[in-house]
Amino acid sequence: MAMWRAAAGHLLGRALGSRAAHTSAGSKKIVGVFYKGGEYADKNPNFVGCVEGALGIREWLESKGHHYIVTDDKEGLNSELEKHIEDMHVLITTPFHPAYVSAERIKKAKNLELLLTAGIGSDHIDLPAAAAAGLTVAEVTGSNTVSVAEDELMRILILLRNFLPGYQQVVHGEWNVAGIAYRAYDLEGKTVGTVGAGRIGRLLLQRLKPFNCNLLYHDRLKIDPELEKEIGAKYEEDLDAMLPKCDVIVINTPLTEKTRGMFNKERIAKMKKGVIIVNNARGAIMDTQAVADACSSGQVAGYGGDVWFPQPAPKDHPWRYMPNHAMTPHISGTTIDAQLRYAAGVKDMLDRYFKGEDFPVQNYIVKEGQLASQYQ
């Protein structure tokens, strides 16, 4: 297909001996890395995205004779993950508690054939290294797009309406209407621009339409003309020309080498003073200190999102302490509904893997050593 092109290291990977795209016969060692549920693990039977829930596939895998190991311990040479790298066949991880799969780890993983992301976004994997090794990398495309788009809309409203200071007043026994109202705004009539209009970006634009906003979008490709007309969104080919027009900017582009650090001090300075930024894409798309400085200076009136770099965010991460933020841990795409969708998607791909069948084409990030074009 046109979307697949050989990665630069693909021929090298083939020369070194690529890994099988489909499973060979016999029992497989499958390792899952998820966040720990702890005291919350047994509070909801559908809470399958945690270590204890294990995506709800343990009984199914073990009934087929496979070995399934699940952990949240993923960092360092003495981690639980590291103990299993050399002989695991499949690694399942998640953007919400990512196991960073470096070229070094791929080199150690002699039996590794398949890397699955339970959710969307596989930038925790060194994709060129995976391609060079002939691996397959796939994710559950579409599994949490609604979840993330809804969360983005929520954060836009939280920041525009200056909700968080009001909430804090109530918690601390205070009452000062002026301290909230002096910078609270309606969403109606504002110009909202999304950087990226893929599945999540389009869903956000559709949800913004009833608010009577002026909607702009920037992407490599224009969305379908009929949908564009239905939503009432205008395409902006030049990102830097779009930014000064926007009262609200939402980041919906994947993290690639082209987008890493995309929003630096200079680009943020091109935005309208007092802009609201929402980023549920990836933290590394932003220059961390530039965002914190812009929030402190007032160039950015509010910054919200659930993505950080690195993750989990260290205690001294500047975004924890910058003014006017609406930051949370990485939660937008791991609602219970999303967990059930991406758990089902992982099970489906594992079943296809065991049977030697292809995955849904949209799920592939690297297919048998070939990197999807958008990650080139």
From Swiss-Prot:
Q: Which UniProt keywords apply?
A: Mitochondrion, NAD, Oxidoreductase, Transit peptide
Cite the position(s) of the site with description Important for catalytic activity.
Answer: 282, 330
Q: Name one GO cellular component term.
A: mitochondrion
Instruction: Supply the NCBIfam families for this chain.
Output: PRK07574.1
Name the protein family: Belongs to the D-isomer specific 2-hydroxyacid dehydrogenase family. FDH subfamily.
Q: Where does NAD(+) bind?
A: 145, 199-200, 219, 254-258, 280, 306, 330-333
> Which named protein is this?
Formate dehydrogenase 1, mitochondrial
Q: How does it assemble?
A: Homodimer.
Q: What processes in GO biological process is this protein linked to?
A: formate catabolic process
Q: Pfam families given for it? A: 2-Hacid_dh, 2-Hacid_dh_C
Q: Which PANTHER family match?
A: FORMATE DEHYDROGENASE 1
Q: Which GO terms describe its molecular function?
A: formate dehydrogenase (NAD+) activity; NAD binding; oxidoreductase activity, acting on the CH-OH group of donors, NAD or NADP as acceptor
Check the record and name the InterPro entries matching this protein: D-isomer_2_OHA_DH_cat_dom, D-isomer_DH_CS, D-isomer_DH_CS1, D-isomer_DH_NAD-bd, FDH_NAD-dep, NAD(P)-bd_dom_sf
Q: What residue stretch is labeled transit peptide in the record? A: 1-20
The EC class name is: oxidoreductase
Catalytic activity, as annotated: formate + NAD(+) = CO2 + NADH
Known EC number = 1.17.1.9
Please state where this protein is localized: Mitochondrion
Function of the protein = Catalyzes the NAD(+)-dependent oxidation of formate to carbon dioxide. Involved in the cell stress response.
Q: Which Gene3D superfamilies match?
A: NAD(P)-binding Rossmann-like Domain
Q: Which residues bind substrate?
A: 120, 144
